[in-house]
Amino acid sequence: MDFDKKGGKGELEEGRRMSKTGTNRSNHGVRNSGTSSGVLMVGPNFRVGKKIGCGNFGELRLGKNLYTNEYVAIKLEPIKSRAPQLHLEYRFYKQLSTTEGVPQVYYFGPCGKYNAMVLELLGPSLEDLFDLCDRTFTLKTVLMIAIQLITRMEYVHTKSLIYRDVKPENFLVGRPGSKRQHSIHIIDFGLAKEYIDPETKKHIPYREHKSLTGTARYMSINTHLGKEQSRRDDLEALGHMFMYFLRGSLPWQGLKADTLKERYQKIGDTKRATPIEVLCESFPEEMATYLRYVRRLDFFEKPDYDYLRKLFTDLFDRSGYVFDYEYDWAGKPLPTPIGTVHPDVPSQPPHRDKAQLHTKNQALNSTNGELNTDDPTAGHSNAPIAAPAEVEVADETKCCCFFKRRKRKSLQRHK
């Protein structure tokens, strides 16, 4: 999220203005929180359960659709937020969520002192899976991720949006056991922005002296330099994330400074001073070719997504890999908000091209049966929701995942 609060007023004001442009809520009936039984509800049928994530603008709760018995994710934002953005994010999801790889959005409406957005519940994030795999992915896994995410980002861009929040925490696999459990999904459009003006239908103008928006570890060099972001910056940030997965860390992690501003300056300086050849040393040349291409793009230029995809699909085929969705975490127990799941390795994997088609997202399998005492949304669901204290983010990432991460004392994360 926008971590430079002292210098990020422009972005926050922009978010306020944009959020006011869309006032239509979901067609579902609106229902305030609380019922005669004291259970916290969103709309007519979504029961609010335990907290499973948090962010700078609110928190994430596990929920349940009482009509279908399906679990959902419920994102909450205080109505009196100084920089409301949830309705804007809801609008972006409505623009996007008719394709594979974007979670379905089910509802937007009030929940007591909060606005609530109800989303499809997904599985672990790539960061969680990275931990599960001892913080290194094989080339095969990175290429399967990269091929899908280039397609995801291309789709976002075709909807006149730039994403501006690339990081492993924002890319999730489907919920284990669902039809899309092996697809990589993109979530959290709180920092997304329209790069095509809806009035003029023209590309936004090039600007400088912009506040930093995104995650410092992965953001593009031009973002560090205060330049307005465009399509090229999303793709460069993806390239940095791909190298993070292959290397296990990036050269600009772990830098120390007296202030956050100085730290982000050091990250940007180190990023610029690290030659692409050094960053990608000992890895296939295609990784360096990708980064060279996206860094040379003009601000207004439309990237050649097919070229970038072909770079990786050709490398994938030459390496003798099969696109069988057997990632490095295949067969490992996956933690979810409703318990650990032991996924099955796909016996009849879909063809690679299916991950790139913009087909309608399928609903998750319902959790059949009556509600019981083991239901994570049943207990303490009438507990008050405490808005997280507004604190300055002290590192490049924030907590924003679909389940709580286990703390590891032996490892310093997000340096």
Curated annotation (Swiss-Prot):
Reactions performed catalytically: L-seryl-[protein] + ATP = O-phospho-L-seryl-[protein] + ADP + H(+); L-threonyl-[protein] + ATP = O-phospho-L-threonyl-[protein] + ADP + H(+)
Positions of region (Disordered): 1-37
Composition-biased stretches (Basic and acidic residues): 1-17
Subcellular location: Cytoplasm, Cell cortex; Cytoplasm
Annotated transmembrane regions: none
GO MF: ATP binding; protein serine kinase activity; protein serine/threonine kinase activity
Keyword Membrane: no
Main location: cytoplasm
Residues holding ATP: I52, G53, C54, G55, N56, F57, G58, E59, L60, K75
Domain notes: The phospho-regulated basic and hydrophobic (PRBH) motif is sufficient and important for interaction with phospholipids permitting cortical localization. Phosphorylation of the PRBH motif by aPKC inhibits the association of the protein with the cortical membrane.
Stated family: Belongs to the protein kinase superfamily. CK1 Ser/Thr protein kinase family. Casein kinase I subfamily.
Subunit structure: Monomer. Interacts with MTA1 (short isoform) in the cytoplasm. Interacts with SMAD3. Interacts with DUOXA2.
UniProt name for this protein: Casein kinase I isoform gamma-2
Species assigned in the record: Rattus norvegicus
